Amino acid sequence: MYSLHNHTTFCDGKKTVKEMIESACRENLEHFGLSGHAPVPYENKWSIPDDEKTAEYFAEIEKYRHQCENTIIWSGLEADYIAGLSKPFSHWRKNFNCSYLIGSIHLVANAGQHWFIDGPSEGYDGGLNDIFGGDIRAAVKAYYRQTCEMLETQNPDILGHCDKVLMHNRGRYIDFADPFHLDLLKETLQLAAEKNIIVEINTRGIYRNLHTDYYPGKYIFGFLKEKNIRVMMSADAHDTDQITGEFSRLKNDLLEAGIKETWLPPQISTDPISLFNPDFQF
């Protein structure tokens, strides 16, 4: 068992590094990783604020790395990509003891402004109207184009919540099955596969009742299976009781779609993790 997408009080998590690691040990996970939000170039309440604090974050993980006997602890980051603004992902790899990087888009750029898609729905709606003139197709296209640019130029180990642009959509603006959206998502997933980047299936929207499906949703599982795209289960946990949130449900949905194994970055494990493994229980 594993869980690599997890946050602490260094960013917007609710629990400390020590508390999150202790929880992973109690769940007897084989691999547990912390992936704090890397600093972004503007003041906010959700990311690690700066490089100095990032160094403290990695030092704190190192302090508790050997907290438990049976769980291997990994230190990662969830890095945002904003062309021309965010630091290159190589900065985090070069300057910190970063085991892996999750590449995610939370801010969609357009004409010098940035649409924050991960806050309250009012901000989502307001940003869509103010930054994209209410044009959901232009906004969705910009999101996926920015994601593909990140994959091409930054080469993260893992692609984070890749259809999160639909988080506050809830059928109001665009149908996830609209060929316009599906083509953009499939293009993004194909590029991830070509770049050997693992696609996370993120459960946070479900257990937080923020979304009706995973990121990306079940509607794309058949395509992932057909194209043999490597996937990883992810909780995006911000508290100790979330680190394997809805993993049992996700495991069953993956198996139902014919996906029989998941993957971790090669620096953690080069072998697929079978969903039929009796140890793979939650």
Predicted regions and their residues:
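C-terminal regulatory/interaction regions
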Residues: 255-260, 269-282
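Short Gly/charged-rich anion-binding patches and loops
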Residues: 19, 145, 187, 219, ...
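Hydrophobic residues within beta-strands of alpha/beta enzymes
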Residues: 32-34, 101, 159, 199, ...
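An N-terminally biased module of ancient metal coordination in phosphate/nucleic-acid-related enzymes
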Residues: 1-83, 88, 93-95, 99, ...
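Extended substrate/RNA-proximal surfaces in nucleic-acid metabolism proteins
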Residues: 53-194, 279-282
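Conserved residues at the C-terminal ends of beta-strands
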Residues: 35, 104, 162, 202, ...
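Conserved, mostly hydrophobic/aromatic
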Residues: 5, 24, 101, 161, ...
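Active-site-adjacent C-terminal substructures of enzyme catalytic domains
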Residues: 179-243, 253
